[in-house]
Structure formats: C-alpha cells, structure tokens
Amino acid sequence: MTFAEFNQSIAGDPAQPPAGLRGAAVALWHDARGNWDAAHDAAQADKSKAGSWVHAYLHRKEGDAANAGYWYALAGRRMPADGVTLAAEWEQIARALVSA
C-alpha cells in the first residue's frame, strides 16, 4: 500500500481498516479517523518498535509527555523537537510504515 492509498482508505466509509493493514499502521488509521481508543489498543498490541513509536505519538497527542517519552525510548527514538506538529509526525510515521 502506498502513502496515497493509505490516505484514501482513511477518507473512505469503511469502519474497519483495509485488509492487509497490520499493527502500528492500523493504529495510525484509527487515529486519523478520530478513534484514539482503538488507535491506542492497536498500538499497545503491536510489540514492535513501530508499535512503540505510534504508542509514543498517541501519548504525545494526548499531552502525556512522560508516558510518551517512555514509549519513544522503547521505539529507539527521541521525542520530536518543539515545533514539530502532531500532523507532521503522523505523516512521518505513516510514510515509514506503509512503505516498509
């Protein structure tokens, strides 16, 4: 799936992510559709570094910097610098996941 296809799937009507989408990408899909709880559940279930990265992003989004920092560390990443928007980070993660 390309990044463009991923974005098109978000804009569509289905209540469930596209077939074949897994783990952290499912979490980002739910987040983009406004379902933080489903996104968090999917990220938490994905024990990979990618899952930890999305998990970190979600806690950053909710304003829990301490918890986000923990998950960024598990993902082997640093918390984004001040000024990096949530939208920019979401796109960075999505591009990394759907092109992987």
Question: Where do the language-model regions lie?
Answer:
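Alpha-solenoid helical repeat scaffolds
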Residues: 53-54
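N-terminal alpha-helical interaction modules that lie
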Residues: 1-49, 59-62, 66-69, 73-100
